[in-house]
């Protein structure tokens, strides 16, 4: 690999992909009437949504190759993809992945408690629907616990799937990735989406995917990864105002790292060995959407998910019930509802201080929000949520947010919102102790939720015909952070572990703050060429504890993304993308953290999409065009070098 040395072949590919056709292009101008549902629980124009929100459209997703959702999120302001290789995760506004809530059609999903200690980054994204099933991705930056409860401290990612059609239709995508460096593993994938009516009132939807990534012959590189999923939905239209849906799905992830290939071959505690991890997720859900004439619209669901880490004999069953009613009352749009969650963890391997293998917990919550149209151009949203947990008691999460449409072009947004994360099951269980190289970790029943208060102000400009810009400033106070400290001998009686490390337990002690700015620009250069870009500045600092003065996470302060799209002809679209990741901040500290600072890097990708027919489209791209090297010695993770992608989409 080279540091950044564009070869003649690379430059030829760039020019060929970006300027491979010449003709007057069709009008690419579009109106900015993007609708979102995550910010308030009902559909509204994005400019009026009471939150900082970004949308990745289906068109954006279709134009190129994404390994998973993390790749698609790299262009979203405020979002940082942490780690590398097949252990990436998502940070929003400087908060760790544990503080990002992931939803699919508004339904929460998480399997993190099947992966204690390291949390197994890179797994959560594998449970998400395949590309062909996704209509759009909505990303809220900042806390949203008033509507969504625990975990929504950093932000919320909501995957919106495609709706049923009145006639049978579908899509299939086949793709392959070929690495220029033959020590890196190639990848093959296929995903599909099919929907259609079974009768006048009953419709069916089925989607799934299979992906195989070969193992690198690079130490600390990508392991062998196999991903498979299948989901089916039945929709029954009871009458014009009420609909029932039954959903069921199965997913599997198998990951293997071998010594001599991607697994560490030296410096291990004891003998370095191969790893073989098998994760499974099964889920079933029933939901109802109703239009109660003269009252409002309701959305109710009951979901059960079973997540299993077969390799470590761990499983967690999550049962969630949520019901929301949105009711217009004069100048008010009132949203209120209830939510309940039951967690049941079975872990036969990680507890080393007692015979206990099962933990469970139940949470209930009530919430209410009101969007009040105080004037024709000004709306004020305020609300609160009361959660009750049998472990820590009750917690209240308020928020207030204003949206002011200065005129048809300018909008000002701002407000104060709160978030919290409830302690995980192992963290609050007194007779539970996990093995850790930095000291065995004991549970603490006195833990309270981690909390945050976010303040933000945004200025948005949009012509409605393609030109749009925004600037957002935010400040987040993070309190009661759960951290590990030395455990008193009268509580942790076992003493040092086999590595000589003294026992630890978790307490609410640390405080931190994050602040920064986010900017976006979309600019139609001509009728056929459009530029879009985003910039993120993030600063974080721990205000207390052993690592006061250090950042909350080891993240870059500066991120920049730019994308150029050219609708070359009616059938041909060319694009190029630049992604800059700045030098990382100082390490956040801790026994398991590397004490070095990863330098900056820039990736440039380019590709084309060509419609062979009305139903068949071929796509090609070169990723990491200039073969920028990101290796373990300098960065702490490995990224792929130059690689070539070829995809075929078929619609029917």
Swiss-Prot record:
Residues 45-162 form the TBDR plug domain. GO terms for molecular function: siderophore uptake transmembrane transporter activity. It is found in: Cell outer membrane. Residues 167-652 form the TBDR beta-barrel domain. Transmembrane segments: none annotated. A motif (TonB C-terminal box) lies at residues 635-652. It is a multi-pass membrane protein. Residues 1-25 form the signal peptide. Its main location: membrane. InterPro entries: Plug_dom (IPR012910), Plug_dom_sf (IPR037066), TonB-dep_rcpt-like (IPR039426), TonB-dep_rcpt_b-brl (IPR000531), TonB_box_CS (IPR010916), TonB_rcpt_b-brl_sf (IPR036942), TonB_rcpt_CS (IPR010917). Pfam families: Plug, TonB_dep_Rec_b-barrel. A motif (TonB box) lies at residues 33-40. Keywords: Cell outer membrane, Ion transport, Iron, Iron transport, Membrane, Receptor, Signal, TonB box, Transmembrane, Transmembrane beta strand, Transport, Virulence. One of its GO terms (cellular component) is cell outer membrane. Regulation of the irgA expression is negatively regulated at the transcriptional level by iron. PANTHER family: COLICIN I RECEPTOR-RELATED, TONB-DEPENDENT OUTER MEMBRANE RECEPTOR. Belongs to the TonB-dependent receptor family. Involved in the initial step of iron uptake by binding ferric vibriobactin, an iron chelatin siderophore that allows V.cholerae to extract iron from the environment. This is Iron-regulated outer membrane virulence protein. It comes from Vibrio cholerae serotype O1 (strain ATCC 39541 / Classical Ogawa 395 / O395). The lineage of its organism: Bacteria, Pseudomonadati, Pseudomonadota, Gammaproteobacteria, Vibrionales.
């Amino acid at each position: 690999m080279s540091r950044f040395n564009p070869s003649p072949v690379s430059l030829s590919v760039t020019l060929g992909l970006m300027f491979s056709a010449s003709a007057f292009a069709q009008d690419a101008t579009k109106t900015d009437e993007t609708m979102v549902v995550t910010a308030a629980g009902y559909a509204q124009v994005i400019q009026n949504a009471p939150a900082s929100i970004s949308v990745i459209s289906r068109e954006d997703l279709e134009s190129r190759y994404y390994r998973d959702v993390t790749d698609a999120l790299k262009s979203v302001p405020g979002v940082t993809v942490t780690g590398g290789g097949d252990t990436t995760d998502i940070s929003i506004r400087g908060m760790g992945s544990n503080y990002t809530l992931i939803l699919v059609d508004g339904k929460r999903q998480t399997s993190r408690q099947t992966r204690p200690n390291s949390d197994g980054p890179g797994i959560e994204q594998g449970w998400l629907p395949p590309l062909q099933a996704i209509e759009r991705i909505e990303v809220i930056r900042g806390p949203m616990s008033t509507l969504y409860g625990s975990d929504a401290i950093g932000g919320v990612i909501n995957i919106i799937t495609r709706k049923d059609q009145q006639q049978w239709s579908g899509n299939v995508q086949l793709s392959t990735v070929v690495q220029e460096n033959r020590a890196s593993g190639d990848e093959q994938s296929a995903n599909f989406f099919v929907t259609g009516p079974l009768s006048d009132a009953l419709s069916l939807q089925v989607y799934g995917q299979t992906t195989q990534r070969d193992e690198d012959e690079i130490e600390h590189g990508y392991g062998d990864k196999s991903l498979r999923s299948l989901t089916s939905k039945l929709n029954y239209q009871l009458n014009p105002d009420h609909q029932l849906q039954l959903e069921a799905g199965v997913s599997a992830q198998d990951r293997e790292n071998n010594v001599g290939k991607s697994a560490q071959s030296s410096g291990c505690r004891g003998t370095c060995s191969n790893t073989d991890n098998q994760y499974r997720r099964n889920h079933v859900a029933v939901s109802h959407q109703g239009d109660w004439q003269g009252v409002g619209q309701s959305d109710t669901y009951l979901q059960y998910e079973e997540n299993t880490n077969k390799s470590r004999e761990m499983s967690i069953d999550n049962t969630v019930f949520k019901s929301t009613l949105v009711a217009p009352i004069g100048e008010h749009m009132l949203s209120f509802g209830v939510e309940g969650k039951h967690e049941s963890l079975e872990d036969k391997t990680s507890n080393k201080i007692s015979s206990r293998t099962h933990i469970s917990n139940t949470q209930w919550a009530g919430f209410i929000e009101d969007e009040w149209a105080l004037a024709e151009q000004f709306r004020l949203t305020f609300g609160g949520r009361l959660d009750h947990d049998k472990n820590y008691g009750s917690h209240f999460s308020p928020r207030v947010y204003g949206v002011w449409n200065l005129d048809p072009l300018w909008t000002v947004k701002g407000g104060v919102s709160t978030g919290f994360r409830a302690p995980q099951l192992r963290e609050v269980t007194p007779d539970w102790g996990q093995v850790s190289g930095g000291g065995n970790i004991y549970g603490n029943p006195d833990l309270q939720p981690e909390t945050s208060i976010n303040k933000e102000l945004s200025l948005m400009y949009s012509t409605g015909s393609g030109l749009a810009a925004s600037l957002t400033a935010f400040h987040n106070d993070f309190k009661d952070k759960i951290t590990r400290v030395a455990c008193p001998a009268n509580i942790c009686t076992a003493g040092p572990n086999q590595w000589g490390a003294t026992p630890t337990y978790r307490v609410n002690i640390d405080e931190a703050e994050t602040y920064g700015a986010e900017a976006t620009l979309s600019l139609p250069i001509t009728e056929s060429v459009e530029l879009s870009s985003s910039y993120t500045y993030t600063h974080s600092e721990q205000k207390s504890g052993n690592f006061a003065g250090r950042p909350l996470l080891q993240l870059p302060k500066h991120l920049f993304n730019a994308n150029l799209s050219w609708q070359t002809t009616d059938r041909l679209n060319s694009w190029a993308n630049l992604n800059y990741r700045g030098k990382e901040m100082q390490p956040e500290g801790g026994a398991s953290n590397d004490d070095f600072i990863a330098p900056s890097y820039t990736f440039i990708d380019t590709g084309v999409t060509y419609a062979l027919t009305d139903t068949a489209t071929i796509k090609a791209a070169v990723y990491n065009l200039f073969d920028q090297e990101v290796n373990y010695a300098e960065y702490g993770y490995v990224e792929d070098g130059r690689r070539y992608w070829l995809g075929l989409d078929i619609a029917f």
